[in-house]
C-alpha cells in the first residue's frame, strides 16, 4: 500500500509563471520516497538514484497536490520505489522511480533513527 502526502503549492515555488518548478517536484518526490522507506522498512536510507518524467504542468494555483509512493522491490540493501505527483483533479503530472540505499537497523539506530510510526501506533523497537 502507498504512503500518501499532501502539499499546497504557491507562487514562490514557480519556475515559469504559475508552474511549479521541476526541481521542487523532484525534491517533493525524493522526500516522499524517503518516507516510504522510513515507514515501510523501518530503517534509514539515502537516495542512490532518482529518475523523473514530467508529464503535465503542475500549477502553483492548484489547491493541493498529492504525492504517492510504494516499494516495488527490495534487493539486499536497495529498495526500489515508484512515485507519482497528482494535481487536485487526480491527474498524474509527474512520475518517478527512486533507488534507495538502505542502512541496517543497527546503523539506523546509531544515526538516531528510532522508527517511523503513526500517531495512533506504538512502535516495537
Task: Please annotate each region the language model reported.
Residues 32-66, 71, 97:
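Hydrophobic beta-strand-centered segment that forms part of the acyl-chain substrate-binding groove
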Residues 58-61, 71-125:
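HotDog/MaoC-like acyl-thioester-processing domains
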Residues 19-24, 41:
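A short beta-loop-beta micro-motif enriched in histidine and acidic residues
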Residues 1-20:
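Catalytic strand-loop segment that frames the active site of acyl-thioester-processing enzymes
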Residues 7-9, 54, 102:
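Hydrophobic residues in beta-strands and at strand termini
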Residues 24-28, 32:
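Short amphipathic alpha-helical face segments that pack within enzyme cores
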Residues 1-4, 64, 78:
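A generic structural signal for beta-strand entry/edge sites
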Amino acid at each position: 500500500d502507498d504512503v500518501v502526502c499532501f502539499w499546497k503549492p504557491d507562487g514562490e515555488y514557480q519556475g515559469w509563471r504559475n508552474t511549479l518548478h521541476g526541481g521542487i517536484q523532484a525534491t517533493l518526490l525524493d522526500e516522499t520516497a524517503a518516507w516510504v522507506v522510513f515507514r515501510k522498512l523501518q530503517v534509514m536510507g539515502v537516495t542512490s538514484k532518482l529518475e523523473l518524467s514530467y508529464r503535465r504542468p503542475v500549477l502553483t494555483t492548484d489547491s493541493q497536490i498529492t504525492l504517492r509512493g510504494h516499494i516495488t522491490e527490495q534487493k539486499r540493501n536497495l529498495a526500489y520505489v515508484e512515485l507519482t505527483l497528482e494535481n487536485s483533479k487526480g491527474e498524474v503530472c509527474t512520475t518517478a522511480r527512486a533507488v534507495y540505499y538502505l542502512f541496517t537497523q543497527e546503523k539506523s539506530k546509531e544515526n538516531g533513527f528510532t522508527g517511523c510510526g503513526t500517531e495512533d501506533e506504538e512502535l516495537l523497537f
